Swiss-Prot record:
Residues involved in Mn(2+) 1 binding: 101, 124, 128, 232
Name of the protein this chain belongs to: Arginase-1
Modified residues (N6-succinyllysine): 17, 75
Induction: By T helper 2 (Th2) cytokines such as IL-4, IL-13 and IL-10. In tumor-infiltrating dendritic cells by prostaglandin E2.
Region annotation (Disordered) ranges: 1-27
UniProt superkingdom: Eukaryota
Residues binding substrate: 126-130, 137-139, 183, 246, 277
Binding site for Mn(2+) 2: 124, 126, 232, 234
Residues found modified as Phosphoserine: 7, 62, 72, 163, 217
Length: 323
């Protein structure tokens, strides 16, 4: 494991303006209510709670071309970037609870200010790499990667609210896992830029063990560096995470999701985490909401050392009779 002190800071990001459905701003509260913090405190990490950010709507936030709520999304991300950078400066792992996935702009930007050599593992049914020119919906939760990529700088007009963003990762610094709903413009971008991805076809063909081996070899083979895991719960199949805004059939299993997060923990390099797109208002039943929230909690815990094989406290002799 890494030698830096093991501590993490939870940042609630109750924000929904990157997409049209209300309720995703209730994600952080649902994860807290499910006992996420208490459970994290049982791991070897020192857990701090930053609380929830209070995002203020920008009045008269008219669309830019077809891009919706640009100033509100830009401002929320600018605020989040500052908080994440502060957490990183203090040597803690930033854990951002979304909120919609447009927040990755701020989360990854803030992380990169302190660790410019970071790499990104993006688990999602979607690439979220539409640009303001290729998007058909105008929803910014489908565009965060385009703002972060150096290779796309200058490929689309300046969006109001985003003047603070400096692209901070290259095409070779990101790997996608779980893709199965990619727009033509996005497919063109990932192919043209040579971005590494494991769609569900590759996951089916190789198995998740090989996928993670290849992911680490590609991102960390030459040099160990901080990992930012941006996890959209729709990366998993809707059988496990139905309460989310854009579910797509045929996704990762619960087991594959846990394997991804367990393996990332084992590298000792996880430095930033996003748990995104839990929308407790979209479950058809209480059971669907519970399943989605509990799955998101389990994925988060696995990132910090909770193992399916079980855990025990180091240095404790469990066979000693109690005094």
């Amino acid at each position: 494991m890494s030698s830096k002190p093991k501590s993490l800071e939870i940042i609630g990001a109750p924000f929904s303006k990157g997409q049209p459905r209300g309720g995703v701003e209730k994600g952080p509260a649902a994860l807290r209510k499910a006992g996420l913090l208490e459970k994290l405190k049982e791991t070897e990490y020192d857990v701090r709670d930053h609380g929830d950010l209070a995002f203020v709507d920008v009045p008269n936030d008219s669309s830019f071309q077809i891009v919706k709520n640009p100033r509100s999304v830009g401002k929320a991300n600018e605020e989040l970037a500052g908080v994440v950078a502060e957490v990183q400066k203090n040597g803690r792992v930033s854990v951002v609870l979304g909120g919609d996935h447009s927040l990755a702009v701020g989360s990854i930007s803030g992380h990169a200010r302190v660790h410019p050599d970071l790499c990104v593992i993006w688990v999602d049914a979607h690439t979220d790499i539409n640009t303001p020119l290729t998007t058909s919906s105008g929803n910014l939760h489908g565009q965060p990667v385009s703002f972060l990529l150096k290779e796309l700088k200058g490929k689309f007009p300046d969006v109001p609210g985003f003047s603070w963003v400096t692209p901070c990762i290259s095409a070779k610094d990101i790997v996608y896992i779980g893709l199965r709903d990619v727009d033509p413009g996005e497919h063109y971008i990932i192919k043209t830029l040579g971005i590494k991805y494991f769609s569900m076809t590759e996951v089916d063909k190789l198995g998740i063990g090989k996928v993670m081996e290849e992911t680490f070899s590609y991102l960390l083979g030459r040099k160990k560096r901080p990992i930012h895991l941006s996890f959209d719960v729709d990366g998993l199949d809707p059988a496990f995470t139905p309460a989310t805004g854009t579910p797509v059939l045929g996704g990762l299993s619960y087991r594959e999701g846990l394997y991804i997060t367990e393996e990332i923990y084992k590298t000792g390099l996880l430095s930033g985490l996003d748990i995104m797109e839990v929308n407790p208002t979209l479950g058809k039943t209480a059971e669907e909401v519970k399943s989605t929230v509990n799955t998101a909690v389990a994925l988060t815990l696995a990132c910090f050392g909770t193992q399916r094989e079980g855990n025990h406290k180091p240095g404790t002799d469990y066979l000693k009779p109690p005094k």
